[in-house]
Amino acid sequence: MTRKIMLQGTGSDVGKSVLVAGLCRLASNHGLSVKPFKPQNMSNNAAVADDGGEIGRAQWLQALAARVPSSVHMNPVLLKPQTDVGSQVVVQGRVAGQAKGKEYQALKPSLLGSVMESFEQVSAGADLVIVEGAGSPAEINLRAGDIANMGFATRADVPVVLVGDIDRGGVIASLVGTHAILPGDDRRMVTGYLINKFRGDVTLFDDGIASVRQFTGWPCFGVVPWLKSAGRLPAEDSVVLERLTRGGGKALKVAVPVLSRIANFDDLDPLAAEPDVDIVFVRPGTPLPDDAGLIVIPGSKSTIADLDDFRRQGWDRDLDRHMRRGGRVVGICGGYQMLGSRVADPLGIEGGKREIEGLGLLSVETEMAPEKTVRNSRAWSREYDVALEGYEIHLGKTTGADCSRAPVEIDGRPDGAMSADGRVMGTYLHGLFGSDAYRSALLKSFGIEGGGGNYRRSVDAALDEIALELETVLDRAWLGTLLG
């Protein structure tokens, strides 16, 4: 029989995704067939699953940790925010429509069937399924029709382990408070809790464990230290971008404007892992640095709205100065679209303006269309004559004179555009920098030798290190029950 456990957080960004990935790798290392599952995710960092269709990037990573092919059923409902109040709704890998907050609350109950169908698919043949919740079950205002936390756990009869983040402070109050406000049926699903991101002498929290036990009756299944290896894993949520920014006199500074609806910013992770590269994620209200050698404009869930914001920040003027200083620019997906002379949305797919003037660094134009391209791709860099692997997730078609200098071939067809002087290029291919040979060639073009280490191997090693750490610190009896 398949064993099942669900990690739910006392809040967002408590580290659930990393813990699920670590537990998946730990179980796999013990010879178990283990699979991850997240009923509902909200993220613009999407991946293309091995069976086609979109899932959250975290579930793709968790499948990698579990050493199993990724599937759209591992994340049956994916919400991709397009505006401050609305999201694109992806169900079992395919776009099902768009919904604003209240509309989605009404829609949720109808999605439970798809969620349960996917859960059955994932569970089939697995020894263990590790489920990740979303946000917190303490948000009882969202409990009606819930499919992400306790609504799913009670329906699927999956025991819950709460995760509290001690690094942000108030972890005892968050655990006890969650116990206090959960309805009785939900509270009974909780079997215990984990403390995450602890720094220092773990015995200093012994009294804390006793206090939580006194108020809730819940046992502690482990105090997990701050996992340094997690810094080598792709991040899923834009709330962590400040922590990803590096700085300090490296050979190459790469500036990345943080767009309001930034998508797939984990494209930059392989560059950030390079010892001679500084990645600077530039928040709104801050100019693009004048000492950057390369500016990367990342993907966007709403290209036209983000291009409006780009100008509002004055980043277009910063970009012009960067070009006059001899700098280089790469645009990926939505960032590529922005680099052209015009972006048109005649059908109103993005829900805002129908047309906007582009940044004018490439002689191309983009027109949005309802057909969405979602696929894993094998590609070739014409620029550096090396093989690439990546994926495409985009709406729209880009055409123009600079497309004649396409920097990439995807499955044998030209993709992207490059300026005549070679300093500006754009492509729809995500994962470009994750190809070691391409990254090495790019760094050499900036005078950096020795780059392009095996990024995938580094991620895999980080997962093993996290699994080993968890095996050391987690309660042995609980872990034994989990692993069988």
Curated annotation (Swiss-Prot):
Gene3D superfamilies: 3.40.50.880, P-loop containing nucleotide triphosphate hydrolases (3.40.50.300). One of its GO terms (biological process) is cobalamin biosynthetic process. The keyword rRNA processing does not apply. Catalyzes amidations at positions B, D, E, and G on adenosylcobyrinic A,C-diamide. NH(2) groups are provided by glutamine, and one molecule of ATP is hydrogenolyzed for each amidation. InterPro entries: Class_I_gatase-like, CobQ/CobB/MinD/ParA_Nub-bd_dom, CobQ_GATase1, CobQ_N, CobQ_synth, GATase_3, P-loop_NTPase. PROSITE patterns: GATASE_COBBQ. It comes from Rhizobium meliloti (strain 1021). It comes from the Bacteria. GO terms for molecular function: ABC-type vitamin B12 transporter activity; catalytic activity. Keywords: Cobalamin biosynthesis, Glutamine amidotransferase. CDD domains: CobQ_N, GATase1_CobQ. Pathway: Cofactor biosynthesis; adenosylcobalamin biosynthesis. This is Cobyric acid synthase. Belongs to the CobB/CobQ family. CobQ subfamily. PANTHER family: COBYRIC ACID SYNTHASE, DETHIOBIOTIN SYNTHETASE. Pfam families: CbiA, GATase_3. The gene is cobQ. Residues 251-438 form the GATase cobBQ-type domain. The active site is at residues 333, 430.
